Amino acid sequence: HGGKIITTKGRPIRLATPDRCKPYYSGKVVGVGESIGTVYALLGEGIIPSMQCVDIFLENMHDFKAYEKAVEKHYKVYAKVFNFVRAKIHHDFSFLKALPDFLSIFRYMKKNEDRFGMHIKMADLMKVAKA
């Protein structure tokens, strides 16, 4: 887009990805969406991932173990995003150490550009890594 970063502002967001929110169910009570960590930590966006989680639940509402497994598969990259964001927050980020996860995050975002509503460029993600 040709713009430049003037300043960055941040607000606290809950960083708990689905892999850190188990169990997703207890008896007949089932967690869905943001209650089980379906927030994309890099953007703080949770509405669309939560609606996707509802679809996963509806497909598996008669088998909670299958639901848990499907959620784990669908949101697998979220753990990598969590690790990336946490390392940046704690000033413990090493690009070389994070490279495999960084590439996975880029591929995921590139594949889902329509969902994110933006063109994903490696150069822009690199700016985030360097910030």
Could you say what each language-model-derived stretch is?
Residues 1-62, 66:
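FAD/FMN-dependent oxidoreductases across multiple families
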